[in-house]
């Protein structure tokens, strides 16, 4: 991650697009040992307002990037405190920085076809905050499909009062535990997905009627055409995972 910049500020000669900012996710706490090692190795004293004893497996791990701002405007190095004010990194530009649009065409015996193709890439977008946090009270809301129980971290088997298994332990899950959304739903690189897309914007099929035919109708020339707009679009399927519900 690039750190040689004025933190979240415009600088001379740089883009006016400050981009998307958030914490840098470096993993997930999957055991109590992970928590102990992270705090010891990085000299962490405060993790998003929590002490080590308050941190739980199933929470995402964020990197301590910098300390407080200094009188000269720069920031101190990592200070053992992870918070959303001083430890953000640039996750992406606001829009894809690269792209192209091209027009193609062909014609044969009065029949022609033209098409406009476009693509953009190099940027990222974030899953909506409501999707990251579980949409409020999960007992009364439909959930995005990526929160399938098979994908969510569970430290140990969970049973109801009658001894029935409700959730099976899943320490190798892809996604963190929903119970800790105050930590896991923070804007971070974990929720960053590619914003690359390609689209077939327009296709026009046209036919020029034979002059021998139309001159009998008193017309010099005539052309019939059919145009389709926004026909095909390819983009990151993760957004569809958000739109679909369990």
Residue ranges and their predicted role:
Residues 1-95, 103, 112-192:
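Surface-exposed, extracytoplasmic segments of Gram-negative outer-membrane nutrient-acquisition systems
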Residues 97-99, 107-110, 219-221, 227:
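Short, well-ordered loop/turn elements at secondary-structure boundaries
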Residues 98-104, 111, 200-205:
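Hydrophobic, lipid-facing positions within transmembrane beta-strands of outer-membrane proteins
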Residues 107, 118-120, 227-231:
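Outer-membrane beta-barrel pore domains and translocons
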Residues 110-114, 212-213:
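Repeated loop/turn-to-beta-strand initiation elements of outer-membrane beta-barrel proteins
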Residues 127, 134, 157-246:
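Membrane-interface anchoring segments and C-terminal beta-barrel signals
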């Amino acid at each position: 991650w690039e750190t040689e910049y004025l933190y979240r500020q415009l600088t001379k000669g740089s883009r006016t697009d400050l981009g998307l900012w958030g914490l840098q996710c470096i993993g997930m706490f999957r055991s109590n040992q992970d928590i102990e090692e992270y705090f010891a190795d990085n000299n962490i004293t405060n993790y998003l307002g929590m002490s080590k004893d308050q941190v739980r497996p199933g929470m995402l791990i964020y990197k301590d990037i910098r300390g407080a701002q200094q009188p000269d405007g720069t920031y101190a190095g990592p200070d053992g405190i992870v918070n959303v004010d001083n430890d953000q990194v640039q996750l992406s530009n606001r829009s894809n920085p690269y792209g192209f649009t091209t027009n193609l065409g062909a014609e044969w015996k009065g029949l022609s076809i033209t098409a406009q193709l476009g693509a953009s890439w190099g940027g990222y977008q974030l899953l909506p905050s409501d999707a990251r946090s579980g949409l409020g009270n999960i007992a009364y809301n439909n959930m995005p499909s990526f929160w399938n129980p098979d994908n969510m971290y569970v430290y140990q088997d969970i049973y109801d009062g009658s001894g029935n298994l409700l959730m099976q332990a899943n320490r190798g899950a892809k996604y963190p535990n929903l119970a800790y959304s105050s930590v896991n739903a923070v804007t971070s690189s974990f929720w960053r997905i590619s914003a690359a897309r390609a689209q077939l914007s327009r296709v026009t099929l046209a036919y020029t009627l034979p002059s021998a035919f139309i001159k009998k109708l008193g017309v010099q020339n005539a052309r019939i055409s059919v145009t389709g707009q926004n026909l095909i679009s390819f983009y990151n399927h993760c957004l569809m995972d958000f739109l679909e519900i369990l």
